[in-house]
Amino acid sequence: MSRIRKPEVHVRGQQPPGGVERARLRASAAAFTSLVALAATGLVAGPAVGAPSAGPCALPRTSAHHSLGLDTWNGAYPQPVRTLDAVMVFLSFPDSTPLTAPAELAADHFPGTSDFFRRASYGRFALRAHAQPEWTVMPKDSTDYAIRRDWAAGKRTEYLRDAVAAADRKVDFSRYDIVYLVADPDAPGVDSDATKVVNLEHPVTADGKDIKRVVTVFERHPPDRNVLAHETGHVFDLPDLYHRPMDGKGDWDTHVGDWDVMGSQFGLAPEPFGWHKWKLGWLERSQVVCVQGPGSRLFSLEPLAAAPVAGGTLGNRLAVVRTGPGTALAIEARGATGNDRDTCKEGVLIYRVRNEAASGEGPIEVVDAHPRTEACWDRSVYPPLADAPLGVGETLTVADDGTRVEVADRTAAGAWTVKVTVPPPSL
């Protein structure tokens, strides 16, 4: 697609012991003054807290940024297994009169983003947005901040400092888990490619609340599809799955194509991978088939994006073969329902997971079951992977480890019968 992906930014800062209370938030300028941009490979580390699940197929979490290890949860991030409240602050500038009302901009993203996560989490997570009804006026012209995708650290610091100070006059930050700073899309200095999550190595405390990260939104009106779902995924410790070419040119979607919103917000099948759902706590261990070899195992997989039957159990949504200390093969069924309603092809999708690969460095790679063909060239972000899933009667032996995946049948209810054979370990 034509839009350039927007990696996260990590920012260092210093703040006085005890943070900045509401009555003293003007001191937030001092807290931000020394902020310096940190390379995108930096970490916002946190304590390990309650594991989403464990077992022989759960890879351990590593120090990689947004590691896909899931034996423990990174306590620096809110886990989306309850209701989380988000504030939307709308920022205007002296050099431009907004052409769009805050309510219209809020409607660009909500309830759509909340609905996306409600479906993806099977109702386990609710994102509740609180949109400020009026514009918050920034102290400087939009052009003064030099907003762009690869933003100069000093200018980004200035923007964040001014935004927090201006918003604090109206916002009680202690009430919110997530902060969205939404800029006037028609201001002359606003660049829509600058939308991203900004992580603060040293949180700024307002109203007794540590602000560890903010989502800076510079989208057009109307915005890119699912853009806020993608950015909010970072707030929950999910990595970028796209591949950024070294020269900034070429295709960004070679790792996962249309599959998962963290690969492309434009994708035809944006439902989060089953591995992501397992990490976030949306899948229980009982809904993950751990295939241990050598030998074969036959089981059924329900479509990942299918809503649970009222009064029924969720059923198997993911199968995993552990292939190494930090690697695994994941297998899931994808169907044209829910967030995947526009998918190019239904079937059983296979992908590799690496727990030591950082965000944007290939933590997930889809295995193409049809490497000589492509599909949906007029709609797909990466047609070579649009037909990656296996169909009924098809078999794939995965290179490197030799695991064989066979799709034996599909039931009338839509579940896929899958046989996985794990070879003996090589000598």
Positions of PLM-derived features:
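Short, solvent-exposed loop/turn elements at domain surfaces
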Residues: D95-A101, A269-G274, N339-R341, S359
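Non-catalytic C-terminal accessory/binding modules of secreted extracellular proteins
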Residues: R3-K6, L59-L70, E201-P203, D207-F218, ...
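Short, polar loop/linker segments at the starts of domains and inter-domain junctions
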Residues: L99-P111, P272-K279, K345, E365
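Secretory targeting and sorting signals
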Residues: R3-I4, G18-A51
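Zn2+-dependent metallopeptidase catalytic core
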Residues: V49-H221, A229, D247, E406
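Active-site-proximal beta-strand/loop segments in catalytic clefts of secreted hydrolases
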Residues: V89-P94, V182-D186, L238-L241, S264-G267, ...
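Extracellular hydrolytic enzyme modules, especially secreted metalloproteases
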Residues: F173, I178, D186-D340
